[in-house]
């Protein structure tokens, strides 16, 4: 079973308090999501493999550490996942970025795929799927299904806020996927919004309703 990592870093929790706050405007909300995305990417990549390399400093030759093994790709779920991407890329600018477009059917609450664009070597990469919210789990499950159907094998999921129900459903559908969360909330309301949550992440990021 994949592990669930809930980050308790003080900087992440401080910024999350403003992200949740209904009085936080679009500009500040966007900047905060960007910053938390970068902080989370630092933690999500903590166990990447390193190899020894010989380098020469201005003083002498020495052995240093550099990343080895599989290369990274981040896959935001459109559209809200885009809000976390720039912060991630500011930390890992060489990472590839794919996109999976999904919308939630208002009647069934099921995720419907409408767009997929991935790096050609997706099966050779460490994949981190990115979405601010993990509510019912439907979007995350469908996005990971889509990736696996195209050959991806090493997948992680990263979000700002998750409901326990969504975590359980994602684990059931994809027990091989580790989940990384900035905050774990108790429940969903009757409209399948995370409670207390932060509202609609996409609307707050892009100033729409």
UniProtKB/Swiss-Prot annotation:
What is the required cofactor set for this protein?
Answer: Mg(2+)
**Cofactor binding: number and manner:** Binds 1 Mg(2+) ion per subunit. The magnesium is bound as Mg-PRPP.
Provide the activity regulation entry from the record. Answer: Allosterically activated by GTP.
The yes or no answer to whether the keyword Magnesium is present is yes
Tell me what reaction this enzyme catalyses.
Answer: UMP + diphosphate = 5-phospho-alpha-D-ribose 1-diphosphate + uracil
- The record lists uracil as bound by 194, 199-201
The EC class name is: transferase
- This chain's protein is named Uracil phosphoribosyltransferase
């Amino acid at each position: 079973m994949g592990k669930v990592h809930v980050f308790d870093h003080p900087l992440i929790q401080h910024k999350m308090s403003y992200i949740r706050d209904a009085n936080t405007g679009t500009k500040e909300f966007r900047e905060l999501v960007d910053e938390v995305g970068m902080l989370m990417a630092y933690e999500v990549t903590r166990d990447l493999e390193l190899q020894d390399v010989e380098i020469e400093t201005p003083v002498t030759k020495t052995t240093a550490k550099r990343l080895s093994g599989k290369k990274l790709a981040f896959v935001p779920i459109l559209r809200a996942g885009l809000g976390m991407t720039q912060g991630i890329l500011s930390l890992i600018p060489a990472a590839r970025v794919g996109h999976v477009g999904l919308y939630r059917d208002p009647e069934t609450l099921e995720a419907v795929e409408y767009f997929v664009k991935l790096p050609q070597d997706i099966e050779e990469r460490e994949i981190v799927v990115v979405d601010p919210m993990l509510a019912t789990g439907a979007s995350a499950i469908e996005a990971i299904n889509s990736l696996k159907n195209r050959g991806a094998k090493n997948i992680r999921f990263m979000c700002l806020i998750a409901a326990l129900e969504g975590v359980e459903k994602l684990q059931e559908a994809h027990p091989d996927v580790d989940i990384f969360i900035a905050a774990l909330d108790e429940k969903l309301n009757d409209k399948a919004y995370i409670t207390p949550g932060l509202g609609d992440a996409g609307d707050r990021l892009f100033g729409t309703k």
